[in-house]
Amino acid sequence: MSHSAEPLPMTARRSGPLTGEAQVPGDKSISHRALILGALSVGETHITGLLEGQDVLDTAAAMRAFGAQVERLGEGEWRVNGVGVGGFAEPEGVIDCGNSGTGVRLIMGAMATTPITATFTGDASLSRRPMGRVTDPLELFGCEVTAREGKRLPLTIKGASEPVPVRYKTPVASAQIKSAVLLAGLNAPGETVVIEAEPTRDHTERMLAGFGAAITTETTAEGHVIILKGRPELKPQPVAVPRDPSSAAFPVAAALIVPGSEIRVPGVSRNPTRDGLYVTLLEMGADIRFENQREEGGEPVADLVVRHGPLKGVTVPAERAASMIDEFPILSVIACFAEGTTVMQGVHELRVKESDRIDAMAVGLRANGAEVVDTQDTMTVHGKGGLDGGATCATHLDHRIAMSFLVAGLASHQPISVDDGGPIATSFPDFLPLMRGLGAQID
């Protein structure tokens, strides 16, 4: 998908039982980090299972622009010859990160403590998203940031020539902020420290340790504390990317709400910092089994077996929000097919994602007959065991909104359409063929 494609309307219709195996794509978070850490290592990193969605391809192109050799060997198989910590070259052109908030924020961190200048841009959706929450801590290292009003893209960073180590307490639970600070800390002398009120997804810490960085985590009175020793020589690693639990959520949800369904989703990451949706679904009474539990690339992995069955409404506590922040849109759909009220707490971060995801879901679900109440920090769905359907939903260039409404249409009484399914390619390029292969009617 190019960055300026024509809208691609799609419609999902009530479908028969979904059956078969759903091979979801590689994890997006780990794919970005594998390319970036490979570029910051000295030598050759071999990656398998890489997600080849537009977001990750944009990160691969950025690593090339900073001087790393990045080549695709085959499907999901890539090789990165890195330039080492502090070895990034100044890019010739502008770094276009497309739709990827993860990509742009991690890359800004990775270059902020190198004495080079880089300009970052993105699509219309990314250019509306707040970057100050990442650039503010990066400036503490000594880099200079020039941005549009509101600290939004396009944005130029002049990297620090003499970076200093930073001790930073994150103001919101965000793995992107934490990761940007840690990546910047790689090329600062001494120890860089990040303090979180509660732990967020920990792929960066796991992978930094795997690549040879000295990194420790501890829980103190201040919170969750991560300490990184600066200026390590990162050693290249083979990275086997597990399958993305956030992408798996869509076929899993479809199987839970379409009567008679039973599907298998192999090799999905069960990282506890990403597991909130599955914890919640089990509380709702979902029939999900985790088979063949194992570890791949430092991440716990399992095969999911999912069957349709009755579901009940639950309350999702705010402290679980960070471990399922990308899954609230699809959970709001599942909640419509449950009996009883589901309350999602602590969801304010969703208002600054690719779109205001709370508003987008609430408006679209109401248009399709659901009873939804939202506040700044909560979303409540009064489940009636089904959904009327019949409406067209605005996706606001947001891949997860588009996929959520298409899944809803597979079990609603009337078809559900989305105004633009094009953005799905950013995270899940094979969404349509995969869902159709299970028996979903989407056109």
Curated annotation (Swiss-Prot):
Phosphoenolpyruvate binds at K28, G101, R129, Q176, R357, R400. It comes from the Bacteria. 3-phosphoshikimate binds at K28, S29, R33, S174, Q176, D326, K353. One of its GO terms (biological process) is chorismate biosynthetic process. Its main location: cytoplasm. Residues 1-25 are annotated as: Disordered. The active site is at D326. PROSITE patterns: EPSP_SYNTHASE_1, EPSP_SYNTHASE_2. Pfam families: EPSP_synthase. Its EC number is 2.5.1.19. The keyword Cytoplasm applies. Keywords: Amino-acid biosynthesis, Aromatic amino acid biosynthesis, Cytoplasm, Transferase. One of its GO terms (cellular component) is cytoplasm. One of its GO terms (molecular function) is 3-phosphoshikimate 1-carboxyvinyltransferase activity. Catalyzes the transfer of the enolpyruvyl moiety of phosphoenolpyruvate (PEP) to the 5-hydroxyl of shikimate-3-phosphate (S3P) to produce enolpyruvyl shikimate-3-phosphate and inorganic phosphate. Monomer. NCBIfam families: aroA. This is 3-phosphoshikimate 1-carboxyvinyltransferase. The gene is aroA.
